[in-house]
């Protein structure tokens, strides 16, 4: 029979594995913080743009009312 091929195995000390996991956890925590800040800034920018649009629409609506009511009551 042919020899069975096996996947090479490696055994690492537990201390090294714990150290690697702690480093990966720290990197993940930093990435979560950075992406949270990025999305928060993006949300603020979108909110500002929507507020500007609402302000313009309400301003135009008030101008139209002023013009229409001003002409009607002359």
From Swiss-Prot:
Its main location: membrane. It catalyses: 5-methyl-5,6,7,8-tetrahydromethanopterin + coenzyme M + 2 Na(+)(in) = 5,6,7,8-tetrahydromethanopterin + methyl-coenzyme M + 2 Na(+)(out). It is a single-pass membrane protein. The chain crosses the membrane at residues 50-70. Its EC number is 7.2.1.4. One of its GO terms (biological process) is one-carbon metabolic process. It is found in: Cell membrane. Pathway: One-carbon metabolism; methanogenesis from CO(2); methyl-coenzyme M from 5,10-methylene-5,6,7,8-tetrahydromethanopterin: step 2/2. InterPro entries: THM_MeTrfase_su_G. GO terms for cellular component: plasma membrane. GO terms for molecular function: tetrahydromethanopterin S-methyltransferase activity. The keyword Cell membrane applies. Keywords: Cell membrane, Membrane, Methanogenesis, Methyltransferase, One-carbon metabolism, Transferase, Translocase, Transmembrane, Transmembrane helix. It comes from the Archaea. It is an enzyme of class 7 (translocase). Part of a complex that catalyzes the formation of methyl-coenzyme M and tetrahydromethanopterin from coenzyme M and methyl-tetrahydromethanopterin. This is an energy-conserving, sodium-ion translocating step. Belongs to the MtrG family. NCBIfam families: mtrG (TIGR01149). The complex is composed of 8 subunits; MtrA, MtrB, MtrC, MtrD, MtrE, MtrF, MtrG and MtrH. This is Tetrahydromethanopterin S-methyltransferase subunit G.
């Amino acid at each position: 029979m042919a020899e069975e091929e096996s996947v090479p195995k490696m055994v690492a000390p537990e201390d090294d594995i714990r150290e690697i996991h702690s480093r990966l956890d720290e990197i993940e925590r930093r990435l979560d913080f950075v992406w949270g800040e990025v999305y928060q800034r993006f949300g603020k920018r979108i909110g500002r743009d929507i507020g500007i649009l609402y302000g313009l629409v309400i301003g135009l609506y008030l101008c139209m009312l002023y013009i229409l009511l001003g002409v009607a009551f002359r």
